Structures are given as C-alpha cells and as structure tokens.
UniProtKB/Swiss-Prot annotation:
This is ATP synthase gamma chain. CDD domains: F1-ATPase_gamma (cd12151). InterPro entries: ATP_synth_F1_ATPase_gsu, ATP_synth_F1_gsu, ATP_synth_F1_gsu_CS. NCBIfam families: ATPsyn_F1gamma (TIGR01146). The keyword Membrane applies. It holds the Pfam family ATP-synt. Transmembrane segments: none annotated. It is found in: Cell membrane. It comes from the Bacteria.
Length: 282
C-alpha cells in the first residue's frame, strides 16, 4: 500500500515540477515583455496627450456645423473592445468583457461591437454577440499601421451614419498589479466653452483639414489604447504566472512532506516486519 502511495506522490511531484517550469518561464517572458510595453506606453502617451491638447483647441474654434462635433443623427453605439490574443493573464480579458456586457445590456438593439484579440472574439461568440469586425494577432508593439486600419473603419462607419457614438473599451495600465477598465467616448467630440483669449488662424481653413486631423487623432488614441492594453495584459500575466509558481512551490513542499512521511512509515513497517520475523524464529 505504501509503495503504491509513494509512486502516486512521485508522479504528482513530477507533474507539478513540470508545471512550475512552464509558469516560471512564462513569468520571466511576461516580465521582459512588460518592460518593453511600459517604455512603448510612455512614448505613445506623450504623443497622445499633446495631440489631445491640439485637437481640443481646434474643436473649440470650429464654428461651422460639423458631424464630428454635432453628431450625425444615428442612435447606434459602437464599442471597440481591446482584449488579448493569448490567455493565462488572470482576469484581464473577462473584466473587459463584463464591462461591455453591463454597458450594452440595456440597449442591445442599438449596440454594435468591434473586437480586437482572439480571447475577446471567443468570449463574445460564446455569449452570442455578433461583431462588425475582428482584428487578431496584434504585435507586441502595435504600430500606426494597425491603429490606422481600425481608425479608417471607425470613420467610415461614423461618416456613413451606421453608428452615432463610438466608445473604446480597454484596460488602462497603472502598475503590474493595478489596471482599470475604461470606456472612453471618442465620437462625436465634446466642444467646450472658450475660457481664454487664445486665437488660432488656420491655413488652409480647418474644415478642409478636419478629415486628416480626425484620422490622425483616432490613430493616436487607438495606439494609446493598444499600448495600455499590452502593458496591462503582460502585467496581469506576470502576476498570474508568479502566483502560479508560488502555489506550485507550496504544493511541492506539501508533497515532499507527504512523501517523506509515507516513506518513513514504510521503512518503519518494514523494520517491524523483519524484527517480527526474527522473533518468530526464536
């Protein structure tokens, strides 16, 4: 009996040891990717924040009617969801999906979805939520190429009045252990009252530049979401894998203890049988 128990524990120790090797390796890879993602995030954040200030000034000085400010009359809402292509990143993806579900459940008929990432596509398919477009296999360091493709699709849907409001749903990165799901409205723009005496002269007129300004702003905004999402994903995966490695270490300690106790018991029993046999032969 003891022999069978020892064999079973040995198998479990081998299995947990192999799993620990995988989780430790994935944790190290995620740490390296997170470091790279954070550098990329800081660079993109500076560009995005500067462009946001410029756009705010431009929007406030446009006096003519413009669908990107006044709206286009459509009641449809578009949600662009940023998820990951890979799993094993804790609650990163499910938190985003839950926020989207809570947002659209009151008005499903007027809610449309574009999903980024294999995991988001999989979750939405299980929930029976149809998508307008799907973007997968996004590189670890997203570029303006990926952002531009999505930006052009958003502009096309909005300018053709297929959607009247556009929201980006993504995970804002604060630290490896703290991320927050945000739902950011990007269209139509919100015009603020002029609070200073700033005067801006445009040549050519800003109305002629609006399409280009809009596309560049959406690229910057989407790239910022990508950068936050990648940092959040790798931070969540690093935390999850480090936690799994710690749990594997604890489990191995317990299994080693069980193994040693069982082996000691088997040795004691064997000695007792030998002594008992010797006594019987006297």
């Amino acid at each position: 009996m003891a022999g069978a128990g020892l064999i079973g524990i040995r198998r479990r120790i081998k299995s947990v040891t192999n799993i620990r090797k995988i989780t430790k390796a994935m944790g190290l890879v995620s740490t390296a990717k997170l470091r790279k993602a954070r550098v990329n995030l800081e660079i993109n954040k500076k560009y995005y924040n500067e462009y946001k200030i410029i756009l705010k000034d431009i929007i406030n000085f446009i006096e003519d009617s413009n669908i990107y400010i006044d709206g286009n009359g459509s009641h449809k809402k578009l949600y662009v969801i940023f998820t990951s292509d890979s799993g094993l990143c804790g609650s990163f993806n499910i938190n985003i999906i839950n926020n989207v579900i809570n947002e659209i459940k009151e008005d499903k008929e007027n809610s449309l979805v574009i999903v980024i990432g294999q995991k988001g596509r999989m979750y939405l398919k299980k929930l029976g939520i149809n998508t307008l477009a799907e973007y997968i296999e996004i590189p670890d360091v997203p570029t303006t190429k990926e952002a531009g493709t999505i930006a052009k699709n958003i502009i096309k849907l909005y300018s053709s009045k297929e959607v009247g409001e556009v929201f980006l749903v993504y995970s804002e990165f604060y630290s490896p252990v703290k991320q927050q799901v945000l739902i950011n409205k990007i269209l139509p723009f919100t015009k603020e009252n002029k609070s200073d005496n700033k005067y801006i002269e445009f040549n050519p007129p800003v109305t002629q530049l609006m399409d280009e300004i809009l596309e560049n702003y959406l690229k910057a905004t989407i790239l910022n979401c990508f950068s936050n999402s990648k940092a959040s994903e790798n931070g969540s995966r690093m935390t999850a894998m480090n936690g799994a490695t710690d749990n594997a270490n604890d489990l191995l300690d317990n299994l080693d203890l069980q193994f040693n106790r069982l082996r000691q018991s088997a040795i004691t029993q064997e000695i007792s049988e030998i002594v008992g046999g010797a006594e019987a032969q006297r």
